[in-house]
Amino acid sequence: LEKEINAYQSLGCLNDMDLSLCFNIKKIASFKYPLEKGCVTKEYDITSHKGIDLGCNKEEENVYASGDGIVSEIIEKSSCGGNIVFIYHNVNGNRYTTIYGHLLDIKVSLGQVVDANTVIGLLGGESTAFINGGYDKCTNGAHLHYTISNDYHTYDFSVYTKDPRWF
């Protein structure tokens, strides 16, 4: 949590300042899917899979932000999720975080303002899979793990997740 607070302060946020105001996050009407094509290979499950897997693609396909927002956290080479990007959004006045896991490569930086045309990373999950000699124990093939969470969360977000198909 201290790391997150320090990151916000380095971006100019003050104590007790609403993050939507601090980051000047533009309101959007809805989310768009982060891939140009593909299919859902694993559905959302509130108890065991808090997101959807978007597959039917090869590694290195572009992954886009789901809408206007700001990159709030980047995790590199996690043993479960690989390279992960978190983005804060304001959808119709409601705060959300989108989370993009199993990225082969990250193309954005912490604090970067993004929109739906911003390539945030490249689809991964196959070459980074532990079973293929990689570091990610939570994948076995090329896909994007895509999660939407209520409010702004970069840790302990799983309690607040929503099925991305609702958007």
Q: Model-flagged regions — what are they?
A:
Residues 9, 19-27, 109-115, 136-167:
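Acidic, glycine-rich catalytic/binding loops that coordinate metals and/or anionic ligands
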Residues 55, 88-90, 149:
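A generic structural motif
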Residues 1:
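Cationic-aromatic interfacial patches
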Residues 5-83, 115-116, 164:
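Surface-exposed, glycine-biased beta-strand/turn segments
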Residues 65-107, 126-143:
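Zn2+-dependent peptidoglycan hydrolase active-site motif and core
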